[in-house]
């Protein structure tokens, strides 16, 4: 009995311990979870109250860059593709036949008019000159003798010792000798001229090209192969074309320049349209339109003192035809294209954005003229446009701050736009902006 009582007592103790453990675990779970839930609920309630009072205060404002619309004097340019040509081009050839004895120029050097370029063997022409001079001396002596005889005949004719026929014959002989002397003088002059032609000089100032004939070759006059070609590049000309629709603007610009005794300025830019090479003026306009292309040719002249323009070089020619006064100008990046047309995002004093439809005018890669829809002094968004909706408040940042955006999504999107994977209509030129008219900003 005692043994059975001990076993029963132990069983009760064991069951009591197990029950106590179970109660402790359940109590901990119940009271601990409840406390956490209460804390979480309090936080959510606080968030709800915060949201109800101030909106999404913990959501950061979208960063954008902005610029202010300004009033400027904007010149209007017409741009056309042109080719640099020498003001004068001379093909140097020999006027006499003979062996090329020497060349007195270096290929590519600048020469002045009158500089000696080449020498032809002068000995044959020296001999011709000597012969002509000898013939002149002979005929001059004959003439002198005939004149003396004529003087005697005239005296004898007065006394009747000779007939009139003999006197006339002697007079004719004198005139014949005078003609021979003149012919001899012409032969001498011709020989001297041929001797002069044996020394070939530069007819104009300019740059010589590559030599076409080597020393020692026999040269004939009138040959198709020149000795060298000289191009005058100080000044130099640019021939370019513009559509026939631009003729009225060009003619008006010429008339305005004539009234003030000024010139119509023309600029030469490189083929990338990023660097201005030279400044010149409009020289002439062709007198007819090319019916094939519907364009007209113009010629501009440049001093080219620094030799930046080279014959046959392709350039972009820009002719200034007008000057817009008090034009409203914004950066090109601010203008967007939508279904309703061109528009910009403007900013009020609270940095809230609003869409404004605008009419664009002259524009280039940096700025665009707003003909209607915007006033000077208004702020417009130039970067971060893809994040905007009507009335949203934004944060205006500097370019440096915008580049250090800590938002991973924004940074990734900006990188994608920089790589060109995300098309951005605002980066390009507005569709209804003039394709060729540019502003002075492209000079910088």
From Swiss-Prot:
Segments crossing the lipid bilayer: none
Bilayer topology term: Peripheral membrane protein
Residue ranges of coiled coil: none
Biased composition, class Polar residues, residue ranges: 37-52, 435-444
Compositional bias of kind Low complexity: 409-419
GO terms of molecular function: efflux transmembrane transporter activity
Keywords associated with the record: Cell inner membrane, Cell membrane, Membrane, Repeat, Signal, Transport
GO cellular component, one term: efflux pump complex
Residue segments, region Disordered: 37-60, 398-444
SUPFAM superfamilies xref list: HlyD-like secretion proteins (SSF111369)
Superkingdom, natural source: Bacteria
Keyword Cell membrane: yes
Position of the signal peptide: 1-20
Subcellular location field: Cell inner membrane
Zinc-finger in keyword set: no
InterPro entries xref list: CusB_D23, Multidrug-R_MdtA, RND_pump_MFP
Family, per entry: Belongs to the membrane fusion protein (MFP) (TC 8.A.1) family.
Quaternary structure and interacting proteins, as annotated: Part of a tripartite efflux system composed of MdtA, MdtB and MdtC.
Protein name as it appears in the record: Multidrug resistance protein MdtA
Source organism of the structure: Yersinia pseudotuberculosis serotype O:3 (strain YPIII)
């Amino acid at each position: 009995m005692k043994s059975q009582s001990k076993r029963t007592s132990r069983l009760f103790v064991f069951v009591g311990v197990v029950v106590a453990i179970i109660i402790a675990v359940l109590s901990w779970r119940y009271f601990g979870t409840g406390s956490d839930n209460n804390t979480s609920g309090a936080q959510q309630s606080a968030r709800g109250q915060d949201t109800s009072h101030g909106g999404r205060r913990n959501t950061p404002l979208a960063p954008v860059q902005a610029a202010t619309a300004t009033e400027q004097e904007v010149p209007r340019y017409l741009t056309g593709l042109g080719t640099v040509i020498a003001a004068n081009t001379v093909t140097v050839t020999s006027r006499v036949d003979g062996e090329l004895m020497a060349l007195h120029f270096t290929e590519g050097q600048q020469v002045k008019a009158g500089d000696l370029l080449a020498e032809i063997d002068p000995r044959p022409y020296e001999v011709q000159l000597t012969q002509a001079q000898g013939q002149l001396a002979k005929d001059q002596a004959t003439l002198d003798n005939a004149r003396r005889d004529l003087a005697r005949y005239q005296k004898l004719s007065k006394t009747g010792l000779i007939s009139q026929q003999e006197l006339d014959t002697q007079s004719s002989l004198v005139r014949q000798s005078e003609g021979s002397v003149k012919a001899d003088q012409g032969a001498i002059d011709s020989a001297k001229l041929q001797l002069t032609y044996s020394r070939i000089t530069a007819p104009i100032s300019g740059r010589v090209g590559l030599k076409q004939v080597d020393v020692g070759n026999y040269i004939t006059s009138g040959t198709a192969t020149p000795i060298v070609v000289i191009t005058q590049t100080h000044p130099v000309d640019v021939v370019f074309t513009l559509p026939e629709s631009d003729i009225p603007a060009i003619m008006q610009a010429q008339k305005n320049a004539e009234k003030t005794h000024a010139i119509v300025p023309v600029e030469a830019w490189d083929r990338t349209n990023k660097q201005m090479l030279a400044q010149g003026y409009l020289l002439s306009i062709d007198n007819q339109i090319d019916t094939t292309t519907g364009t007209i040719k113009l010629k501009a002249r440049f001093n080219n003192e620094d030799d930046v323009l080279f014959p046959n070089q392709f350039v972009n020619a820009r002719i200034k035809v007008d000057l817009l006064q008090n034009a409203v100008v914004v950066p090109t990046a601010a203008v967007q294209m939508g279904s309703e047309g061109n528009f910009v995002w403007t900013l009020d004093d609270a940095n809230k954005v609003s869409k404004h439809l605008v009419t664009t005018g002259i524009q280039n890669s940096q700025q665009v003229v707003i003909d209607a829809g915007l006033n000077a002094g208004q702020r417009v968004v130039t970067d971060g446009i893809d994040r905007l909706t009507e009335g949203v408040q934004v944060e205006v940042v500097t370019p440096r701050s915008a580049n250090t955006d800590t938002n991973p999504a924004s940074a990734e999107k900006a990188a994608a736009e920089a790589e060109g994977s995300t098309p951005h209509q605002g980066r390009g030129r507005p569709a209804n902006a003039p394709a060729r008219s540019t502003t002075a900003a492209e000079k910088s």
